[in-house]
């Protein structure tokens, strides 16, 4: 009996060892494959959207429908990026496709849904969706970029005989349809178009018709690419600051915005208005000088400007009654977004978002490397543990105090001065800031100018890795 028990124990032990060895062997062979996102919704017009496979392993794809196809986009040793391209839906029914992804032993299905074709006499760029919230629109805006130093160029030395002289004054070529299409082809979903409307403004505050025509032409190129556009008043702070206290300045502000509203009243959800740019009252209050009463006065003036802007737009005609609008915080500095003295305007349409600019740390984002000014010296690099902590802490504050409380946020400008810095450190900063913004449900809009990241001569990005890393962010953080 003892011998049988001993044999049983030895047999059991041997089986257990073999099982564990097999399990360990299987664990070593097991490769975790991640395919994301696994569901997509396309509008009736079709288009392309990206998904990723991590790690980068050979994959095969089978689509259940001929109108839905997969093509390779880009790859790194860590991740492969693919495009799902969907043809326009010409049927009156919602349609669905299943893409079967096979990577070694791993099989994953991606579900694709496309909206039905609805006969309409109204082009999409004129459409207002009644139930579209501003937060949902922010999601649609994806990654954004600025057409900077172009329609916003100013200077009394500029020849006023042709409006295009202003457009080229700060180094930009004349904007073409191909330049605008290049942003969309690169993957950007929204374009901010800063405009200095004071160029050639008449004494009775009438916008020059050539400027109005030019803005509308560039706007139409933008909308026809499927992008969302933002138009503002830029570089006119000296007189705009006087609006709360000077009747003539208020008349000028009101006149310009009424003309903008009238000209663009037919455009729909894909056009947003922004009242001004980086307005502050340093002569009244700064964080380093002035009393709490002075601060309340300075921030109150910006509140007044926002409310005046909303009132003008809402009381104008056409689609402006339900247009999604941006409002600004003091100096567009992040910390004033959640300052108790900042007040969101009253808006009967409830279609407002905050716009914030992010140039932190200032001695990297604003100054060139080694540049010396009275308040500091420009850093040549960025990317320490402390740098990332500062970035994430700032974006966490915005999310906690605004996004999580139902206030949508756009980071309307961010970038870094490239002087005396490598493209690698500029790329690291811009991509890191973009990811920190996007991952928290906000819309990042890179400040880009002639000679910046996007080459307006070739209509491509000079640093392909910059674009590749940027476009991997929406794949990493899919939105509904």
Say what each PLM segment does:
Residues 52-83:
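Surface-exposed binding patches on compact interaction domains or structured appendages
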Residues 251-387, 396-416, 439-442:
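Active-site region of glycoside hydrolase catalytic domains
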Residues 385-463:
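Substrate-binding cleft of secreted/luminal carbohydrate-active enzymes
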Residues 118-190:
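N-terminal carbohydrate-binding accessory modules
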Residues 21-41, 106-125:
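Bacterial Sec-dependent N-terminal signal peptides
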Residues 126-127, 170-191, 201, 205-234, ...:
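An active-site-proximal structural segment forming one wall of the substrate-binding cleft
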Residues 34-62:
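Solvent-exposed, low-complexity, repeat-rich "mucin-like" stalks and linkers
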Residues 82, 93-105:
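A short beta-strand micro-motif common to beta-rich folds, especially ectodomain repeats
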């Amino acid at each position: 009996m003892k011998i049988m028990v001993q044999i049983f124990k030895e047999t059991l032990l041997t089986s257990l060892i073999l099982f564990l060895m097999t399990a360990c062997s299987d664990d070593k062979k097991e490769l975790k494959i991640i395919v994301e996102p696994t569901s997509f919704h396309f509008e009736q017009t079709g288009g392309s959207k990206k998904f990723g496979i991590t790690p980068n392993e050979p994959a095969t794809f089978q689509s259940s429908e001929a109108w839905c196809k997969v093509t390779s986009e880009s790859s790194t040793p860590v991740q492969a990026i693919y495009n799902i391209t969907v043809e326009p839906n010409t049927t009156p029914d919602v349609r669905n496709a299943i893409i079967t992804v096979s990577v070694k032993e791993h099989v994953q299905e991606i579900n694709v849904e496309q909206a039905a074709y609805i006969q309409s006499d109204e082009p999409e760029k004129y459409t207002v969706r009644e139930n579209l919230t501003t937060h949902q629109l922010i999601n649609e805006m994806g990654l954004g970029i600025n057409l900077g130093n172009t329609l916003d160029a100013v200077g009394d030395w500029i020849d006023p005989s042709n409006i295009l002289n202003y457009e080229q004054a700060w180094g930009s070529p004349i904007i073409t349809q191909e330049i605008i299409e290049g942003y969309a082809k690169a993957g950007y979903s929204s374009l901010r178009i800063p405009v200095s409307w004071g160029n050639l403004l008449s004494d009775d505050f009438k916008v020059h018709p050539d400027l109005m025509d030019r803005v509308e032409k560039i706007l139409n190129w933008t909308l026809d690419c499927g992008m969302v556009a933002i138009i503002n008043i830029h570089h006119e702070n000296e007189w705009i600051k006087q609006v709360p206290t000077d009747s003539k300045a208020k008349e000028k502000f009101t006149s310009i915005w009424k003309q903008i509203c009238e000209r663009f009243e037919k455009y729909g959800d894909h056009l947003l208005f922004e009242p001004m740019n980086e307005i502050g009252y340093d002569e009244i209050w700064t964080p380093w000088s002035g009393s709490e009463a002075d601060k309340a006065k300075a921030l109150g003036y910006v509140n007044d400007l926002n409310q005046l802007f909303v009132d003008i737009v809402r009381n104008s005609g056409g689609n402006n009654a339900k247009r999604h609008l941006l409002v600004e915080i003091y100096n567009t500095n992040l910390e004033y977004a959640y300052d108790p003295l900042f007040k969101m305007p009253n808006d009967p349409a409830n279609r407002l978002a905050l716009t914030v600019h992010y140039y932190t740390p200032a001695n990297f984002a604003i100054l060139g490397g080694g540049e010396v000014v009275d308040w500091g010296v420009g850093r040549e690099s960025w990317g320490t543990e402390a740098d990332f902590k500062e970035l994430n802490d700032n974006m966490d504050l915005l999310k906690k105090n605004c996004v999580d409380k139902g206030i949508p946020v756009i980071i309307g400008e961010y970038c870094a001065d490239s002087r005396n810095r490598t493209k690698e450190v500029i790329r690291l900063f811009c991509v890191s800031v973009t990811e920190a913004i996007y991952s928290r449900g906000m819309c990042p809009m890179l400040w880009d100018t002639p000679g910046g990241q996007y080459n307006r001569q070739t209509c491509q990005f000079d640093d392909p890795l910059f674009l590749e890393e940027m476009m991997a962010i929406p794949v990493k953080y899919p939105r509904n």
